[in-house]
């Protein structure tokens, strides 16, 4: 079998064409949700609004007291936290501001009425 000049030219430039093609980019991973375990003092928690379950919750985030609510089925926050922390007991709390979903493993245990 003989190669024509055109066939030879195609085989000669094919590797260069493949190398010039842009590589497939992998999807950009979502940034990790923040995880905070330190609870607010009771006096700070008492200032927080109640969640739909009538409990007040507060977490210390970088030295600041942040009120959080148990967002439950209203968002995918809890599911995302369970996946991220690889723990079925993980919880996700909703807030307003820079961190709309905050992960927590202790369930914001100082929650109370």
UniProtKB/Swiss-Prot annotation:
It is found in: Secreted. Induction: Expression is highly up-regulated in invasive hyphae. Its main location: secreted. Transmembrane segments: none annotated. It comes from the Eukaryota. GO terms for cellular component: extracellular region. Keywords: Secreted, Signal. Coiled coil: none annotated. Residues 1-20 form the signal peptide. Secreted effector involved in biotrophic colonization of plant cells. This is Biotrophy-associated secreted protein 3. It comes from Pyricularia oryzae (strain 70-15 / ATCC MYA-4617 / FGSC 8958). The lineage of its organism: Eukaryota, Fungi, Dikarya, Ascomycota, Pezizomycotina.
């Amino acid at each position: 079998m003989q190669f024509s000049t055109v066939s030879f030219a195609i085989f000669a430039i094919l590797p260069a064409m493949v190398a010039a093609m842009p590589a497939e980019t992998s999807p950009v991973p979502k940034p990790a949700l923040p995880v905070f375990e330190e609870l607010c003092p009771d006096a700070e928690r008492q200032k927080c609004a109640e969640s739909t379950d009538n409990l007040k919750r507060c977490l210390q985030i970088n030295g600041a007291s942040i009120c959080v609510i148990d967002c439950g089925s209203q968002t995918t926050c809890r599911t995302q936290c369970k996946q991220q922390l690889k723990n079925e007991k993980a919880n996700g709390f909703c807030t307003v501001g820079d961190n709309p979903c905050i992960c927590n493993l202790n369930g914001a245990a100082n929650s109370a009425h």
